[in-house]
Design a protein with these regions (language model features):
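N-terminal helix-turn-helix DNA-binding core of bacterial DNA-binding proteins
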Residues: 2-44
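Accessory beta->alpha helical hairpin/"wing" motif in late/C-terminal subdomains of nucleic-acid enzymes
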Residues: 76-80
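Amphipathic alpha-helical dimerization/coiled-coil segments
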Residues: 82-110
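A cross-family signal for key residues in well-ordered alpha-helices
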Residues: 14, 28, 47, 85, ...
Length: 110
């Protein structure tokens, strides 16, 4: 699936706001929170993680996953928390504008 620029970053930051996670855990959380609608290909996920780490929004360290395998764990930095706040406001405004253009109302579906 193609995502608008910045979408992957804000989804990763939001996921990491709940605590550190490895790449597979981040991808799984996004898929589960979106009820299977959104998924990240490995290449897109790891490109975003490297980009965000170079910007200082996240940091990483090696550790052991739940199944005792070596994995790189990512966590959000204070700069990442600030960026998440900025991006959340921006996405909220964007989503509201698109809903208005499409003459839609947000309703949770059963």
């Amino acid at each position: 699936m193609n995502y608008l620029q910045g979408t992957v970053d804000v989804m990763i930051l939001k996921t990491l706001s709940g605590g550190p996670s490895h790449g597979f855990g981040i991808s799984k959380a996004i898929r589960e929170r979106s009820e299977g609608v959104l998924g990240l290909e490995d290449a897109a996920l790891y490109q975003a993680l490297h980009r965000m780490e170079s910007k200082g929004w996240i940091e990483s360290e090696w550790g052991l996953s739940e199944n005792n395998r070596r994995a790189k764990f990512y966590q959000m930095t204070p700069d990442g928390e600030r960026q998440l706040s900025i991006e959340t406001v921006s996405w909220h405004r964007y989503a509201l504008a698109v809903f208005k253009v499409l003459d839609l109302r947000f309703e949770a579906r059963p």
